[in-house]
Amino acid sequence: MNNIFKGLITAAITPFKDNKLDLYALERILKHQIKYEVDAILIAGSTGEGSSLSFEEYKLLLQTSVEIVNNRIPIISGCSSNNTAYARELAAESTKIKVDGFMASPPSYVKPTQYGIYKHFEALHEACNLPIMLYSAPTRSGVDFSDETILRLSKLPRILALKDCGVDLERPLRIRAVVKKDFNILTGNDEVVLAFNAQGGVGWTSVASNIAPDMCKELLEKWNKNDTKGALEIHQKLLPLYKALFVESNPIPIKYAAYYLGLCENEIRLPLTEASDSAKKQIENIITSLSIKL
């Protein structure tokens, strides 16, 4: 099975207008990613406000994304839920719509044991025939995979990758040493991408690439060609952007940045709220200093 979980994966925002999906803006967002040839697009993840979507909205978002992208780059769906039965529904629907793979985190809030986490993902694995990427986001989930659970899950044939949003930079080395050869490890933190890849990572799921896919793609290409100096130069330029996009809870800042550049409305669903004036100013200044344009 081809492992699509590698390279630059954009964690796409979900555009809204008048509290409904804005499908015209979605087309702009996705075509911007296609233009710069990102390696995959993640739909309805944390950055895409997946937890705020109704099931009907989720289906419409995936179906429209598949139609717009039209097999030009892989589409990965977010299937995280603290309700295993509902997560299975999301995975089954993703299979029906024919996305290329899905990502899911351990159930949040309920704090399952490691055995419970394993059984949750075993159930998702049984619900579909898609490649799966584990999503380690302990600050959001309240729980995390142990190394042993990652190893155990990696033995399921279609669990092919781990997206790691933790801060343990030794972890990719530990995991890489014990999992199957074709199991990929990616970071979900923009600002540590080079350090993470130096420890065995093969790419990253990026928030910043919503608005700077060209720079993010070039950074990774230079890194993969062993042009460490060139990759570091781009990384240093992007660091202020990475930080600005997390000055408030993600996806608040990136939604405003996309609005400022004309990609979509600055509409975000409760309990998230619009960026503060100070955050807006910081984002505007960095976009201007980096000469980011569509």
From Swiss-Prot:
SMART domains: DHDPS
Record localization: Cytoplasm
Protein name: 4-hydroxy-tetrahydrodipicolinate synthase
CDD domains noted in UniProt: DHDPS
InterPro entries registered for this protein in UniProt: Aldolase_TIM (IPR013785), DapA (IPR005263), DapA-like (IPR002220), Schiff_base-form_aldolases_AS (IPR020625), Schiff_base-form_aldolases_CS (IPR020624)
Subunit structure: Homotetramer; dimer of dimers.
Pathway this chain belongs to: Amino-acid biosynthesis; L-lysine biosynthesis via DAP pathway; (S)-tetrahydrodipicolinate from L-aspartate: step 3/4
Pfam families for the chain: DHDPS (PF00701)
Active site: 135 (proton donor/acceptor), 163 (schiff-base intermediate with substrate)
Function statement: Catalyzes the condensation of (S)-aspartate-beta-semialdehyde [(S)-ASA] and pyruvate to 4-hydroxy-tetrahydrodipicolinate (HTPA).
Species per Swiss-Prot/TrEMBL record: Rickettsia felis (strain ATCC VR-1525 / URRWXCal2) (Rickettsia azadi)
PROSITE patterns for the chain: DHDPS_1 (PS00665), DHDPS_2 (PS00666)
Keywords for this protein: Amino-acid biosynthesis, Cytoplasm, Diaminopimelate biosynthesis, Lyase, Lysine biosynthesis, Schiff base
The protein's Enzyme Commission number: 4.3.3.7
Family, per entry: Belongs to the DapA family.
Primary subcellular site in the record, as a coarse category: cytoplasm
Catalysis: reaction(s): L-aspartate 4-semialdehyde + pyruvate = (2S,4S)-4-hydroxy-2,3,4,5-tetrahydrodipicolinate + H2O + H(+)
One GO BP annotation of this record: lysine biosynthetic process via diaminopimelate
Recorded GO MF terms: (R,S)-4-hydroxy-2-oxoglutarate aldolase activity; 4-hydroxy-tetrahydrodipicolinate synthase activity
CC terms in the record's Gene Ontology section: cytoplasm
Entry binding sites for pyruvate: 47, 205
Site (Part of a proton relay during catalysis): 46, 109
